[in-house]
Amino acid sequence: SLEKYADQVPVREHEWDNRHFWRVSNAEQLEMSADCGIINLSHFHMTDISGPDHVALLEWLCAAKIGGDANIGKGIYTHFLDDEGNVRADFTIFRLADRCRLVNGADAGPRDLNYMRRVAQDRGLDVTITDVTEDFTTIGIWGPNARTKLQEVVEDPAALEKDAFPFAAIRQVRIAGRDVSAFRISYVGEQGWELHMPYADGLAVWDALRSTGVIAVGVETYANSRRLEKSLRLQNADLRTEYNLLEADLARPKVKEADFRGKAKHLEYRAREHQPAMLCTLVMTDNIDSSGIARYPVGILPVLDPDTGEVLVDELGRRSYTSSIAYGPTIGRNIALAYLPWSHAREGRKLVLEYMGETFPAEVAAVGYKPLYDPENLKPRS
């Protein structure tokens, strides 16, 4: 892939910016976007919540509606809020007939599992909460040809057709003689599925997918570069308890009827004329440093006002730093997410990022959730 896309993937000349296989990762992303790729997602943490009160527990903890027969067989992206209505966690819940499976990141998973256990105990709920991470593994398959490639290896190819398999649905398929739960979703902005299966079946399914000629794509594309081109938020980076769900622009159009933790504060925030800050997408408009070297920043960068040279501070005293940053090879820019004060959260607003003692011009490309790549989100639903 690197040979194929060498002219589209920058060479990072500065030693600090080049401490990773960035060019390989970027080339993999471009190939996935042009054709198809599979990604090892075995780092997912999984928790099963069952028992008579399992829906009641999750209805209380989650901002999204979990109950109701209409949600059975669906994947629900949702959040835990704290009592202040700020974002404590994000994850996907698979609403199964007799239980819910919470699919989480490896870092936040154990934390959220123990939190659920404590809340269930405090509220006297009859639930069983089990860590099933070691029992299952996940493979992502994405790209414009994901359906075609997956149809080569499933027993019932017609079941994958667009009308038969709606976006966000979960269906059982068979690959290489193994039962697989296919979840039609995308964190990389392309058509495709998460494939969930027993851990012991992972290698057989992986080999079957590879036999179609698809490339294996590293997790950098999933976790950073394409994620930022899609304006997707990362827990413990962009989603933190210092900011609320509206500032992260992840609030649903309507608030569910059922009570949930943080609901009162969430309603209070919704009634505001505007939020104190908004999570915005920034692009660096010039990345050449004083030595004439193009920089590709990593880490956390202060966001400055170009007129004063001072770090931006919102009305609650929160300072603006990049919460995520990566080079997006499809867009061809360094892209960052950062919470900006309402006064500065305007598309086209000129800002400055500080990196290693130097300043680089940037501008606000989007306020709130607004992808730079495929802004209408047509590709994942294709």
Model region roles, listed by residue range:
Residues S1-T78, N86:
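Acidic, proline/glycine-enriched N-terminal capping motif
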Residues S33, S42-H43, R88, R95-D98, ...:
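Short, well-ordered loop/turn elements at secondary-structure boundaries
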Residues E28-M32, D83, D90, A176-F183:
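Membrane-targeting and insertion segments and their boundary/processing signals
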Residues W60-D122:
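Well-ordered mid-protein domain cores that form the structural environment of catalytic cofactors
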Residues S1-K4, V9-H20, N26, L96-S382:
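Conserved, structured C-terminal
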Residues P52-V87, P144-R178:
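Internal amphipathic helical hairpin motif
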